[in-house]
From Swiss-Prot:
<comment type="similarity">
    <text>Belongs to the fluoride channel Fluc/FEX (TC 1.A.43) family.</text>
</comment>
<keyword id="KW-0997">Cell inner membrane</keyword>
<keyword id="KW-0406">Ion transport</keyword>
<keyword id="KW-0479">Metal-binding</keyword>
<keyword id="KW-0813">Transport</keyword>
<dbReference type="GO" id="GO:0046872">
    <property type="term" value="F:metal ion binding"/>
</dbReference>
<keyword id="KW-1003">Cell membrane</keyword>
<keyword id="KW-0812">Transmembrane</keyword>
<dbReference type="InterPro" id="IPR003691">
    <property type="entry name" value="FluC"/>
</dbReference>
<dbReference type="GO" id="GO:0005886">
    <property type="term" value="C:plasma membrane"/>
</dbReference>
<keyword id="KW-0915">Sodium</keyword>
<comment type="function">
    <text>Fluoride-specific ion channel. Important for reducing fluoride concentration in the cell, thus reducing its toxicity.</text>
</comment>
<feature type="binding site">
    <location>
        <position position="78"/>
    </location>
    <ligand>
        <name>Na(+)</name>
    </ligand>
</feature>
<feature type="transmembrane region" description="Helical">
    <location>
        <begin position="71"/>
        <end position="91"/>
    </location>
</feature>
<feature type="transmembrane region" description="Helical">
    <location>
        <begin position="101"/>
        <end position="121"/>
    </location>
</feature>
<feature type="binding site">
    <location>
        <position position="75"/>
    </location>
    <ligand>
        <name>Na(+)</name>
    </ligand>
</feature>
<keyword id="KW-0472">Membrane</keyword>
Amino acid sequence: MFNTLLAVFIGGGVGSMARWLVSLKLNSASAHLPVGTLIVNLVGAFIIGLTLALFSRMTHIDPVWKLLITTGFCGGLTTFSTFSVEVVYLIQEGKLTWAAGTILLNVAGSLAMTMLAFILVNNFASQ
């Protein structure tokens, strides 16, 4: 149990630091679209899809690594709460089109990235 908790703790810490650094660097790039949040959500969606697809095929790998990457790192990297508050701010500022675009890009983009990761692993594994 300790190894499991430690893996989630380490992964979450690294993911959270990565999210903060990306947001710090990229959110100022656009006054309307929180680019950093979008990037971490899309990258996190891809990583979790890739990890789950790989682990379903590579059952010999210790499941603690899966927890470190998915629950820990991806949980720390991706951010629904920041995404939510950024959309609310856009709505409060009357930027309804930007708010809708942010929602669409984050939700549809994250689903597409997760699906892409599964497709890539399945195509690679079938060769």
